[in-house]
């Protein structure tokens, strides 16, 4: 059994985080940090929506110093919410911010100098680099101790240091070790006001790395709180479902003390989604809620089970979506066309796990998961609120699909129309990589570093490429963080400056500093040159 993780308590200003305290909700402004009044105004809107911590980008010295003016303005208006500085590449900015705000977020992959290596680092060279990290981190820790400032050590899947990449590769193990190295330094320096996070736009990687982080922390006697989020989740329904599947899977396992839902657009739209996700956990958090399940489920099993085929379910068939239409149990495709009818008598040849995530896992724990009967995951939903339906079903089904469990999903709702239920189901399969039926778009929520209208640009990129099933295309606001956080993408559209864009193929730059008004045409030409373009079918 995966043991229950109980985090310690840290304080973000006056706000306690961890232990049995409620799961805290946070977001990040997307205003220019140099625009003091706009940042203050947006922070207030976030707080009024239910945000408990506000993060602000501080990419340079000027922005870090501006945090003092923003904090002063908020306090004068009676807003006492803790502020978090988001730092990349600039330790000096972090040190300035640590004397002003309640928490500083650093990325171990780019906080210290990224010395390029030729591979196969010797143990001596590896240890020497660690010593340099200690030297670089010491001033920040001293300032944080003197000011009661917390630190989030936030690893990103796509921005691991070359030293970590040499030894561990681009893996969850590398992500975890990158964070734990910094955590051990904090402990050795007598600093414990620490929060960890593992971020990826790939829900499976995010879940796997966070589970591994918790296991490693427990093995080393650490109990730091954990921040959860699917980075660059995208926009609209897809972003909501992707975030809920990743965050909810871990909350179901008792992991997670604060969350941020990253949606492209105004950050205020993130808060209702975050509230919908945390609602059922905050009512149970004061109890010893722990998910029921077998060791097989809890160990993070992700390979798809081998099963026989029954009426188009299981075997070599893709994970199916079952919908009740006109009194019949139908298998439908992503266009809501019926591709098969499931006779009632065939249900006896299937294993049906019914209920919410807790009930389904409890039932599955009694099954022989090495039996070759296909498993249908089924649950009924009484809500007529689309957001609540999307969040609940993404958690219930997603938390099992991520672990390779489920040959079909069968959401039942009498208050949400059947076509919307089917669309939500396919979005859950896409989010968990259980079945790919369309283009996947990875996009950042934008921040003060973004110099173009990312919502408009994302819609333009979608319009041009949404027919390219199976491709992953990223739209990122800035060159500072974009390339690292779109590691899972096949192609990337990244803001490079005012009016200019850099295009990526995988992790490599394909075209630099393209005028923004030409970028989509150049992206299409890049797709054609790479053999990934096809014309959209006529409707």
Regions found by a protein language model. Give the residues of each.
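N-terminal amphipathic alpha-helix/helix-capping segment at the start of soluble metabolic enzymes
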Residues: 1-27, 141, 145-147, 283-327, ...
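Active-site mouth loops of central-metabolism enzymes
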Residues: 20-38, 82-90, 163-176, 231-241, ...
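Conserved, mostly hydrophobic/aromatic
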Residues: 25, 86, 153, 196, ...
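Glycine-rich, proline-tolerant flexible connector loops at the mouths of alpha/beta enzymes
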Residues: 30, 49-74, 108-128, 194-203, ...
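Glycine-rich phosphate-binding active-site loops on the catalytic face of alpha/beta enzymes
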Residues: 52-53, 101-118, 253-268, 399, ...
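Alpha-helix-loop-beta-strand connector modules within alpha/beta enzyme cores
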Residues: 63-85, 132-148, 213-222, 461
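Glycine-rich tight-turn/loop motif centered on a GG-T
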Residues: 102-136, 163-173, 510-512
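Catalytic alpha/beta core domains of metabolic enzymes, predominantly
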Residues: 124-133, 165-308, 345-468, 472-475
């Amino acid at each position: 059994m995966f043991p229950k993780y109980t985090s310690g308590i840290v304080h973000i200003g006056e706000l306690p985080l961890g232990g049995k305290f409620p799961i805290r909700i946070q977001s990040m402004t997307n205003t220019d940090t140099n625009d003091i009044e706009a940042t203050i105004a947006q922070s207030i809107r976030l707080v009024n929506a239910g945000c408990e911590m506000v993060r602000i980008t501080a990419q340079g010295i000027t922005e870090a110093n501006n945090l003092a003016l923003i904090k002063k303005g908020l306090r004068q208006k009676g807003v006492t919410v803790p502020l978090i500085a988001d730092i990349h590449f600039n330790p000096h900015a972090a040190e300035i911010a640590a004397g002003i705000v309640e928490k500083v977020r650093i990325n171990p992959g780019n906080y210290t100098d990224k010395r390029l290596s030729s591979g196969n680092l010797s143990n001596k060279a590896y240890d020497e680099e660690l010593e340099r990290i200690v030297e670089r981190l010491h001033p920040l820790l001293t300032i944080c101790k003197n000011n009661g400032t917390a630190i989030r050590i936030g690893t990103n899947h796509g921005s691991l240091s070359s030293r970590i990449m040499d030894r561990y590769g681009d893996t969850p193990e590398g992500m975890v070790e990158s964070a734990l190295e910094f955590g051990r330094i904090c402990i050795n320096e007598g600093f414990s006001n620490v929060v960890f996070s593992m971020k990826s736009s790939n829900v499976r990687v995010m879940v796997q790395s966070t589970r591994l982080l918790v296991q490693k922390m427990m093995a080393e006697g650490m109990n730091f709180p954990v921040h959860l989020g699917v980075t660059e989740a995208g926009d609209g329904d897809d972003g909501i479902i992707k975030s809920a599947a990743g965050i909810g899977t871990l909350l179901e396992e008792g992991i997670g003390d604060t969350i941020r839902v990253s949606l492209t657009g105004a950050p205020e739209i993130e808060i209702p989604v975050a509230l919908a996700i945390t609602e059922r956990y905050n009512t149970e958090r004061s109890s010893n809620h722990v998910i029921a399940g077998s060791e097989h489920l809890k160990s993070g099993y992700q390979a798809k089970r081998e099963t026989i085929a029954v009426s188009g379910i299981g075997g070599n068939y893709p994970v199916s979506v079952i919908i009740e239409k006109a009194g019949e149990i139908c298998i439908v495709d992503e266009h809501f066309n019926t591709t098969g009818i499931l006779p009632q008598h065939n249900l006896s040849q299937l294993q049906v796990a019914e209920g919410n995530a807790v009930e389904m896992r409890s039932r599955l724990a009694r099954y022989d998961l090495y039996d070759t009967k296909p498993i249908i995951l089924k649950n009924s939903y009484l809500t007529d609120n689309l957001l609540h339906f999307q969040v609940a079903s993404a958690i219930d089904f997603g938390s099992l699909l991520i672990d390779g469990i489920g040959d079909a999903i069968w959401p039942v709702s009498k208050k949400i129309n059947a076509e919307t239920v089917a669309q939500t189901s396919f979005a859950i399969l896409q989010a968990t990589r259980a079945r790919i039926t369309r283009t996947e778009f990875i996009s950042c929520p934008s921040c003060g570093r973004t110099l173009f209208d990312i919502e408009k640009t994302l819609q333009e990129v979608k319009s041009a490429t949404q027919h390219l099933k199976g491709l992953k295309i990223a739209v990122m606001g800035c060159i500072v963080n974009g390339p690292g956080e779109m590691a899972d993408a096949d192609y990337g559209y990244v803001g490079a400056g005012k009016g200019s864009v850099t295009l990526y193929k995988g992790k490599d730059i394909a075209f630099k500093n393209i005028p923004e008004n030409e970028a989509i045409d150049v992206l299409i030409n890049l797709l054609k040159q790479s053999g990934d373009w096809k014309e959209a079918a006529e409707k």
